[in-house]
Amino acid sequence: MTKAIVLGGSRGVGKSISNALKTIEIDVFAASKNEIDTSDLNSVKKFLEKNTQTDILVLNTGGPEPKPFLTITEEDWKFYHNQLFLGFVTILQNIKINNGGYIFLISSSVIKEPNAKLIISSAYRAAFAEVFKVLSKEYAEKNISCV
């Protein structure tokens, strides 16, 4: 049976994706923030100890609340750097996607049209989207599709 891991799979868009995959008889692990918190790299590493491979990986996470640039703290930048960028990088460096598999990146329109009130989300989601584009060429050589 095909296996899928859906980050943020317990509510919102992630839950809808999880439910849709289940209707086509895919074994879905709908990971909540309790199972993996991408803002906490120790949580990511612990998750990866138990989840070493999959056929389908859905990279999905919430984002920061709208905030004017001058009110964003250093802690905000660090927290969302991990949640929206480094957590996903760590996952891709350490999980095996099976041959013929898929990786889906659920992101935001801010990667194409930055939003001044969502500057953290705009910056980190766009940065990871670029990494994802570069990696898609490497994954394609292994018959893994990046969407």
Give a label for each model feature.
Residues L7, T54-G62, L84, L105, ...:
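Rossmann-fold scaffold of SDR-type NAD(P)-dependent oxidoreductases
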Residues V58, G87-I95, V131-F132:
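Hydrophobic positions on the long internal alpha-helix
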Residues G63, L70-V89, F104, S121, ...:
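Catalytic Tyr-X3-Lys loop
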Residues F104-F128, F132-E141:
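Catalytic loop of short-chain dehydrogenase/reductase
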